[in-house]
Amino acid sequence: MRNKGFTLIELLVVIAIIGIISSVVLASLNYARKKARDAERLSDMRQMQIALEFYHDSFDAYPDSDNAGCGGWDSSGNGTFITPLVSNNFLPKHLQDPVVNDSCGNLAYYRYPPGYAGCSASNGYFYVLGIRDLETSGNPYRSSPGWNCPGRNWQDEFDWVTGSFQ
């Protein structure tokens, strides 16, 4: 006469299958979270570009970099990313990287003087705005506009980068 119920081996097989399925689900959820954070970063960059153009239209210049560390770049790690855009109401709040890995963050802005890195001095000041590390993409990100001068290619330093002359 056979006892009703599951054997130990049957239970172990079921537990192993559940473990495998749950690890696959968790891995795909983690990737989805990374893609969502990258989408937020790219959206922030689009907002930032629009705010920079509004600032330029109002003041006939792009805002200065704060040069407060991070290699002189104005960066998103300290919560004061491009303060003039917020203080002049071109952005509702400071944009910050969704995952701050260090005091610099992944978002960066710098305004360069005319003629820097071999760019034509007649074009005037210019800014570079970029994302250093997208979680789901290598360098460069497929839709990165890119930015370079004869003496420097910022796309080599960022996953996504853009810029504009004043």
Q: Predicted regions span which residues?
A:
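Short, flexible coil/turn micro-motifs enriched in small/turn-prone residues
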Residues: 11-14, 18, 33, 55, ...
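Generic N-terminal leader/processing signal
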Residues: 1-2, 33, 39, 140
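Extracellular/periplasmic head regions of type IV pilus-like filament subunits
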Residues: 53-133
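Membrane-proximal N-terminal amphipathic helix
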Residues: 34-61, 81
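A generic fold-level signal
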Residues: 3, 40, 121-124
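Exposed, low-complexity/repetitive linear segments and helix-based recognition motifs
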Residues: 35, 94, 153-156
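Short, surface-exposed interaction loops/tails
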Residues: 120-166
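N-terminal single-pass transmembrane signal-anchor helix
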Residues: 2-29
